[in-house]
């Protein structure tokens, strides 16, 4: 009994050590708050040599009631430098033997006419933008088993089809000078949110990276991963990927450019007018992994940037610039801003990330704002503040 008491005390102290950070990261807020003009005076971090841009999600544009082509044209009119486009496998191959890249061709043509540099996500299994999973049904014998690790040995047919798809895409577009990098998969080895628990193995992703490099040895490969900004998410992410590491860890091993997906505040649950949010992004204990990642890139210096320089380059692949609430399509209420991302947060999140590079002597390879389609939908409903916050960054940075 005496030996049990210290053990119980130690267990209690350990539990408190986890619980205390969690409690400091919880925020109970009104879900929708009155719009203000704070974005007009939010400090804008100089970008230096870091190119700025957006990711374009045609499916999200349509979900918000926008015509995707017109939405892309509206965004391309802004004076940013970089845009990320994506090949959605099930749209490009809607039936066995089909190859229909026409829509992606049009997007790339429009970006080139606007003088933008392009990061092309070739997927193929996962790509950015909900639902993030785009394998044609005819390429699978059945649904991927929940909880499974998708390996080359257990899924040779899927891997062969994936390699064929990425090779065909890279060979089609490698002559386009606007393309600066190929993105392979999206958060490659993480589970697919809360909807699916299967994961791609590192070996599966490595084979795809090798295929892209074989088809175009001269361009870098980008892989992205979610940077946990709260203790509960960090613990869950570690537990679910503990066998091979999460997507950021795998990106550091396989890719030339590591893309960070940064979402400092997101909703957990709502009740009436209130929502409980997680926000631990500025807590000291949440800075350590990001610092290690940037330190590694900064220590590597400005030397060769080929496949032998994994982890040398870092880019903010997704900087939160739209709300992350408890629904898939962010709400848009007249005269209100959702607490997870207000117009001023578009600027504050950007400035926070750019300050990381400055503090660690590193020039980020880019900062891509996430949520551009939402800004357009807000403007159409009479609220241009998100777009104006973005424009202010472009003007002042």
Residue ranges, per PLM feature:
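N-terminal carbohydrate-binding accessory modules
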Residues: 3-82, 210-213
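Aromatic-lined substrate-binding rim segments of carbohydrate-active enzymes
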Residues: 41-43, 68-141, 194-224, 274-284, ...
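Hydrophobic faces of well-ordered beta-strands that scaffold small-molecule active sites
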Residues: 50-56, 81-85, 118-122, 180-184, ...
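Short, acidic/polar
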Residues: 61-77, 162-172, 233-251, 343-354
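Aromatic- and acidic-residue-enriched segments that line the glycan-binding/catalytic groove
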Residues: 97-102, 126-151, 198-199, 236-238, ...
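Substrate-binding cleft of secreted/luminal carbohydrate-active enzymes
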Residues: 119, 123, 311-397
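Active-site groove signature of glycoside hydrolases
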Residues: 130, 150-158, 162-198, 365-369
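Glycoside hydrolase catalytic-domain groove-lining segments
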Residues: 202-203, 207-210, 214-225, 229-329
């Amino acid at each position: 009994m005496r030996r049990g008491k210290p053990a119980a005390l130690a267990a209690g102290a350990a539990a408190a050590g986890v619980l205390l950070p969690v409690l400091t990261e919880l925020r109970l807020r009104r879900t929708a708050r009155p719009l203000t003009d704070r974005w007009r005076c939010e400090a804008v971090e100089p970008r230096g040599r870091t190119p700025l841009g957006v990711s374009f999600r045609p499916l999200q544009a349509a979900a918000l009631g926008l015509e995707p082509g017109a939405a892309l044209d509206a965004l391309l009119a802004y004076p940013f430098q970089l845009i990320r486009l994506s090949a959605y496998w099930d749209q490009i191959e809607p039936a066995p033997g089909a190859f229909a890249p026409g829509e992606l061709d049009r997007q790339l043509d429009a970006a080139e006419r606007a003088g933008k540099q392009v990061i092309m996500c070739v997927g193929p299994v996962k790509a950015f933008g909900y639902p993030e999973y785009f394998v044609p049904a005819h390429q699978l014998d059945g649904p991927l088993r929940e909880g499974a690790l998708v390996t080359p040995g257990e899924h040779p047919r899927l891997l062969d089809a994936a390699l064929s798809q990425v090779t065909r895409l890279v060979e089609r577009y490698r002559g386009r000078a606007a393309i600066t990098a190929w993105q392979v998969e999206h958060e490659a080895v993480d589970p697919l949110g809360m909807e699916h628990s299967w994961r791609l193995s590192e070996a599966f992703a490595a084979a795809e990276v090798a295929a892209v490099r074989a088809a175009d040895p001269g361009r870098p490969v980008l892989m992205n991963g979610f940077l946990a900004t709260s203790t509960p998410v960090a613990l869950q992410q570690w537990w679910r990927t503990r066998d091979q590491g999460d997507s950021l860890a795998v990106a550091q091993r396989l890719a030339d450019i590591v893309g960070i997906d940064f979402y400092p505040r997101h909703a957990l649950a709502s009740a009436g007018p209130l929502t409980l949010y997680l926000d631990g992004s500025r807590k000291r204990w949440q800075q350590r992994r990001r610092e290690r990642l940037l330190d590694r890139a900064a220590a590597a210096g400005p030397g060769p940037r080929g496949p032998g320089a994994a982890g040398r380059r870092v880019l903010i692949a997704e900087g939160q610039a739209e709300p992350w609430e408890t629904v898939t399509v962010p709400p848009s209420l007249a005269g209100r801003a959702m607490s997870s991302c207000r117009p001023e947060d578009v600027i504050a999140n950007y400035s926070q990330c750019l300050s990381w590079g400055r503090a660690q002597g590193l020039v980020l390879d880019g900062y891509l704002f996430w949520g551009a389609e939402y800004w357009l939908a807000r403007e159409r409903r009479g609220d241009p503040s998100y777009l104006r916050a973005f424009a202010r960054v472009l003007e002042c940075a």
